[in-house]
Amino acid sequence: KFPITRPPLRNHGNYVVSLNKLVKWLGGLVEQEGINLFTQFAGAQLIYEGEGIAGVITEDKGLDKDGKPKDNFTPGYELRAKVTVLAEGPCGSLTKDLVSRRKLDNLNPQVYGIGIKELWEVPAGRMQPGFTAHTLGWPLDSSMYGGGWVYGLRENRVSLGMVVSLEYHNPLFDPHEAFQKYKTHPYVKRILEGGKLVRYGAKTVPYGGWYSMPRTYVDGGLIIGDSASFLNSQRLKGIHMAIKSGMLAAETILEALRTGDASARTLSAFPKKVEDSWIKKELWEVRNFHQGYEHGLYAGLF
């Protein structure tokens, strides 16, 4: 255990929340304002017009395993909008297609990590709600960039996981296997012993930061959140920036609707708003953090 907690990892006064519950709560607020949410429909392709986008087409329903229509086939819906906001996460298919078609990735290529997470229910009294621990090292070797966490939630639940950058050199390394080893560490094992797994998941993480941001606007479209590389790789936190970038996008869209102009010229106000907000300050301070670990763990620490 380190004798001191480094400032970026100090979480006193913060909240440990379920992102799933937070999103559901926000969705309820949105629906109270008369806005429709289509949570069962995935976007299959963007509607391209000119140099920009004009909406999205949802995926077809009622297809068999070979992709052929069944009796209950329903074609995807064409949803048009004056401004379409892409918030698909770091590897969204629509965002990647837009960035490629419109050549929006004019900076460094994005680099990724993979995060594996589990939610456990443990015996009563073992974990204090709000407890946070960040781990470094084993089972990752010193050449790898990554680490783990243990968070205490309410109702005797524990969130734990591990993230590792995908630049590791060993082709036989298995992140999922490494996470299973992680749970055998005496510290983690004591927490989980006698508990049960409730759910699990995995996601990619955009490590590129400020220098890997794509252009975030086109005619009729904006890119926010992880899709825009808004993640602090030092603190491994991005939800707050996803929410803030969504708020800034809303301000930009409101101005576009008021003027009746949703062109790239008007929507270019969005990255300016990002630069004037605390998002720029936070990302700029850690712009070289990941690169500092290019030669391994110990070089990065010092």
PLM regions: where:
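FAD-binding beta-loop-beta segment adjacent to the flavin cofactor pocket
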Residues: 202-233
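Alpha-helix N-cap/helix-initiation motif
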Residues: 11-15, 19, 74, 105, ...
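Active-site-proximal substrate-binding core of FAD-dependent oxidoreductases
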Residues: 229-235, 247-300
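N-terminal FAD cofactor-binding segment of flavoenzymes
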Residues: 1, 94, 102, 277, ...
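Flexible, glycine/charged-enriched surface loops at secondary-structure junctions
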Residues: 190-201, 260-267
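A conserved beta-strand/loop capping segment in the N-terminal third of enzymes
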Residues: 1-12
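Alpha-helix capping and helix-loop boundary segments enriched in small/acidic/polar residues
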Residues: 107, 170-173, 212-215, 233-241, ...
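Predominantly flavin-linked oxidoreductase catalytic cores and closely associated redox partners
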Residues: 20, 24-25, 29-193, 229, ...
